[in-house]
Amino acid sequence: MFEVVPFDIEIGQYKVMLNIADARAMGLNPGDRVRVRTRGASLTAILDVTGQMIGQGQVGIFTEAFRDLKEAKSVEISPAPRPASISYIKMLMDRQKLSEDQIRSIVRDIVYNNLSEIELSAYITASYIHNLDPQETEWLTRAMIETGERIYFDKHPVVDKHSIGGVPGNKVSMLVVPIVAASGLLIPKTSSRAITGAGGTADLMEVLAPVEFTADEIKEITETVGGVIAWGGATNIAPADDRLIKAEYALAIDPYSQMLASIMAKKGAVGADAVVVDMPTGPGTKLETPEKARVLAKDLTDLGERLGIRVECAMTFGGSPVGRTVGPALEVREALKMLETGEGPNSLREKSLALAGILLEMGGVAARGEGYRAAEEILVSGKAHRKLMEIVEAQGGDPKIRSEDIQIGEHQKQILSPTNGYVVAFYNKRIIEIARAAGAPGDKRAGVIIHKKMGEIVKKGEPLLTICSSTDWELECAVKMCSMRDALEQPPIVVEGMLLERYPTERYPRTI
């Protein structure tokens, strides 16, 4: 038996640490697997060794393993074999087709933390270089669904929405969910937090209400009020996806077949019958051309058909932010204002009604081609606002909150136009970087207000942006980013007059 020394450090996998003398006595090396047992619990962990941190007869156990070992005081340790899934990952590297059982084995080992970070990286890299075929992608999706919690609804149809992302200010779920729920359809929207953006849908909803719920609670709220906006990471829905996303982010790659499976596994796990996929398209987005978007749309609809889920994809304009705000509180205030009045930025209104309308048609509430009008009626009548307040209350928020009640960062700075002219370029990536420098999404009150968008007339000295932050130093960092100029960076907004350049360039040109 080894005395347990808990390490209060989360590392995303099961890992233990032995004194080097104990490891040598057992014939173990760093990176080997060991079976760790205590009364009522056991798991397989990756071994690390030390000469000083842990004494002989002791074992250091990191947070994830310590928690699942029921915070045991002592444990037994023995050598464990390598998972068979490692050989299947090598098969993928060698371009060999995998069977359904082999794919299920890989996913199971990902879920149960049986793969080291290096082995997981090898799987992701192999998937990136050698895409899975449609059959393998279906098996991967089903395995991701089956290894986590699932929600089964008694009432149908159940509809859902997903966005490919890449566009700042894409707050449309804050309108789509209440519009669809107000129509009588069920929409259990599980969403992500921002990883590289200025605010995911879960970050936005958290301005109004808690977003961390179990799968059973998501089902209960959805069946009670028609919809929910929850953080998927708080559930055990498609748990393999969370670990894969973290590794993909570290490697800065996004394997295509893995992306397809990730999208559809989450939707299949919540019991969706129909899904609309928002596909922002244009320069600076993940789908820069309509051709790329159409390929993805076909693959998603084909995968949905294999899984028994009806999928429709909507290619949307992604060349500039949706609405005129970026950052959680600012975006929620803008969305809530539109729900209260039915009016607001055209890009936000049009996109929200278009996506909601597609879901109303897919759910049988509206005839083909009539969904937009039906969604607009729900918005203008105030039904969508009332439904969002029901959802907010069901999730533990204040149902009486108004848009003007939402606080934004008190430290603010306007970025002014240097000249008369028109907005001729708008760089989404730079807007996101500025909002993050101001503190978003961690600081819910931080972000950017956009005063001028593509094609709009602007006079010298008029505000282009207002940056909001809760601290002076973050505001200063964000303001500095607006004026950065080098070969690799673009300003967030480019303003040009009608005269772009004069030639020849002499100070006193010749006269006739």
From Swiss-Prot:
Record-stated family: Belongs to the thymidine/pyrimidine-nucleoside phosphorylase family. Type 2 subfamily.
Source organism of the structure: Methanothrix thermoacetophila (strain DSM 6194 / JCM 14653 / NBRC 101360 / PT) (Methanosaeta thermophila)
Protein name: AMP phosphorylase
Cited InterPro entries: AMP_phosphorylase, Asp_de-COase-like_dom_sf, Glycosyl_Trfase_fam3, Glycosyl_Trfase_fam3_N_dom, Glycosyl_Trfase_fam3_N_dom_sf, Nuc_phospho_transferase, PYNP-like_C_sf, PYNP_C
Organism domain of life: Archaea
Sequence positions that bind AMP: 166, 192-197, 201, 262, 286
A GO cellular component entry from the record: cytosol
Function, in words: Catalyzes the conversion of AMP and phosphate to adenine and ribose 1,5-bisphosphate (R15P). Exhibits phosphorylase activity toward CMP and UMP in addition to AMP. Functions in an archaeal AMP degradation pathway, together with R15P isomerase and RubisCO.
Single GO BP term: pyrimidine deoxyribonucleoside metabolic process
Disulfide bonds listed in the record: none
Keywords of this entry: Glycosyltransferase, Transferase
GO MF terms held by the record: 1,4-alpha-oligoglucan phosphorylase activity; AMP binding; pentosyltransferase activity
Lineage, broadest ranks: Archaea, Methanobacteriati, Methanobacteriota, Stenosarchaea group, Methanomicrobia
Active site residues per record: 254 (proton donor)
Catalyses which reaction(s): AMP + phosphate = alpha-D-ribose 1,5-bisphosphate + adenine; CMP + phosphate = cytosine + alpha-D-ribose 1,5-bisphosphate; UMP + phosphate = alpha-D-ribose 1,5-bisphosphate + uracil
Stored CDD domains: MopB_CT
Entry's EC annotation: 2.4.2.57
Keyword flag Transferase: yes
Keyword Cytoplasm: no
SMART domains associated with the record: PYNP_C
A Pfam family reported for this protein in Swiss-Prot or TrEMBL: Glycos_trans_3N
Family annotation (HAMAP family): AMP_phosphorylase
